[in-house]
């Protein structure tokens, strides 16, 4: 006997409760100017007095897609309490720095962390360094978007690589009609799950990811923490054709503020 819709809804509620994670959602807005240390998508970065903008092997500057000022986030257990985290990708590359063979490679992306940002270069000094050569980026070069953060809790998304395993185990514990994968379910049941489960299609820090294609991680991947997700908005941000970018990190590395090994992916 097939489970009823009410029984399936109860199962999804149980799964959601069992997989709750903290997530910080991000809304953007256009502004005239932001401080160099403000949270932002795009725009001009904070650069220490003795620092330099990251560059590729030919000496061309990377493009900063995001800067997060940790002190501007709501109280959370995801990010460091203080400092600036910057996300950079290579300019002038059709894949926006994505390495399909080694998504943790830093050849096409960099994550920089400044635990105690002191007085840095002035805007004029930053502009002298930050001159993009190709301007082939997912955002209009130099245009900046201010960020507003909201914290909540949310269960696993349908896109997450571990969803099928978690859901299948819970289904088989609950119902006599056993399955090996979610794809063993009737189409109408899968459609109902799509309506009930969080999609995660938004800019976010933490929580579970969203993909337009599929999760690049293997099951039980050590890259469990969603450091940042940037969605396309059709207006100011465009990853390919309405795609989404994700940056994942090992939980221990995040706790130790070690951002050398971050898994970067985007798809559309």
Task: Identify the role of each PLM range.
Residues 1-268:
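Preference for intrinsically disordered or flexible, low-complexity segments
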């Amino acid at each position: 006997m097939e489970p009823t819709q009410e029984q399936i809804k109860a199962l999804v509620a149980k799964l959601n409760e069992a997989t709750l994670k903290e997530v910080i959602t991000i809304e953007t807005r256009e502004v005239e100017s932001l401080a160099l240390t403000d949270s932002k998508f795009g725009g001009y970065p904070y650069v220490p007095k003795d620092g330099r903008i990251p560059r590729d092997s030919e000496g061309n500057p990377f493009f900063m897609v995001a800067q997060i000022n940790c002190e501007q986030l709501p109280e959370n257990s995801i990010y460091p309490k203080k400092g600036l985290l910057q996300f950079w990708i290579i300019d002038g590359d059709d894949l926006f720095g994505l390495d399909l063979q080694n998504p943790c490679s830093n050849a096409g992306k960099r994550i920089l962390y400044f635990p105690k940002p002191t007085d840095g270069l002035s805007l004029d000094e930053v502009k002298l360094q930050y001159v993009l050569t190709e301007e082939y980026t997912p955002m209009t070069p130099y245009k900046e978007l201010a960020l507003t953060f909201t914290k909540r809790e949310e269960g696993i998304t349908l896109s997450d690589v571990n969803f099928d395993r978690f859901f299948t185990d819970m289904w088989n514990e609950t119902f006599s009609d056993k399955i090996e994968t979610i794809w063993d379910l009737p189409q109408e049941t899968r459609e109902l799950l799509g309506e009930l489960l969080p999609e995660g299609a938004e800019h976010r820090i933490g929580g579970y990811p969203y993909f337009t294609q599929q999760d690049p991680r293997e099951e039980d991947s050590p890259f469990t923490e969603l450091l940042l997700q940037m969605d396309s908005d059709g207006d100011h941000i465009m990853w390919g054709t309405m795609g989404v970018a994700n940056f994942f990190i090992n939980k221990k590395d995040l706790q130790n503020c070690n951002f050398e090994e971050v898994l970067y992916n985007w798809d559309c």
